[in-house]
Amino acid sequence: MENPFIITGYIKPEYFCDRKQEAKRIITKITNGENIVIMAARRVGKSKLIDFCLDSPIIKDNFISISIDILRTSSINEFAFELGKAVFEQAARRSTKLLKMVVNTLKSINGCFGYDPISNTPTFNLSLGDISNPLYTLEEIFACLEQADKKCIVAIDEFQQIGYYPEKNMEAVLRTYIQRCSNANFIFSGSERHLITEMFSEKARPFYNSADIMNLDVIPIDRYTEFAIGLFHHFDKDIQAEAIALAYHTFGGNTYYIQKVMHEAFNQTDPKGVADSEMIDAIIRSLILDNDRKFSEILSRLTLPQKELLYAIAKAGMAKKITSAAFIKKHNLRSGSSVQSAIKKLLEYHLVSTSQATYYIDDQLMGLWLKM
């Protein structure tokens, strides 16, 4: 039996929860020549929403869409690598004409192009070491976008990551290329709201006022409850509203983990059966135990002050004034300067996020594990 609670891969429109107004706004903006910034906490569905929009008929039929996630990148070389690979894999393979144009334009990495006689398809064997001059490669990539036979839509997920690159002029470099490119519009998305907000809202920054800003909140519980019950009913199963509420509130409306719990609850519920809160609680406990080794390994790489602060933030839930004497005393931390050094690294490692001077564990499941 098909499981309608999709965790990875393509989501059919009928299995996509809510977000109709958000999708309409994104599609309207981007197809009318505007750039847009989407800000949301991690795992509330921004990437799936972007994929859903790029897969809409109006975009699929009239635009070339290119999508990359740069969360794991740490330099301009890696950025050029990811974007170059995406241009070839997601755009150039659409037609022989596009392929020839990309091959002729990406001259700085021309030796990476080849052909597979078995599958009868072109290949692009690019490795990070092949990019010796990333600025020149980026210039060529944007030239490819400019010369494409259809207008391009480029989605860059976790865009705030460029702020961590050692190349301090990265924002100015990218802004220059984007401004010059008349044949592409951009979707910038990010989960570190404070960094994305500063990047697009501060007058001194290169991306100031260059895109429409959209905040993506969690799906309201009433809408998700209606969605989940409807899918269970469609397959002749049932689930208690209280069970859905338990999953929803445990993960603070985090779409990814709620879907994961619902996916397993659907698997465990027989036709004519009912998923209840007891089942949901057992699934959540199992999820935490399944990730014990992963979270333990993450902690093993942290210094003692970083671990102590991570546990303190997990215990607080939403931690404020973390360098204050009261917070330090309550959680037996070392000093204000020690906390400042530790939080800088925890933010850099994406273990903690911040919004409006409040700090919280980035991964809700890890937060639950830390409190066990």
Residue ranges, per PLM feature:
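Helix-loop-helix "sensor" segment of P-loop NTPases
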Residues: 198-249, 271-273
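C-terminal leucine-rich, beta-strand-based interaction scaffolds used for sensing/assembly
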Residues: 2-4, 293-372
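P-loop NTPase nucleotide-binding core
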Residues: 39-44, 48-153, 337
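A short, basic N-terminal segment
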Residues: 1-36, 41, 59, 111, ...
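Short, Lys/Arg-enriched N-terminal segment that forms or immediately precedes the first helix
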Residues: 7-11, 285-300
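Conserved C-terminal helix/linker of AAA+ ATPases
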Residues: 244, 267-290
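Conserved Walker B catalytic segment
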Residues: 124-192, 201
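C-terminal helical "lid" of AAA+/P-loop NTPase domains
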Residues: 245-250, 256-270, 308-314, 344
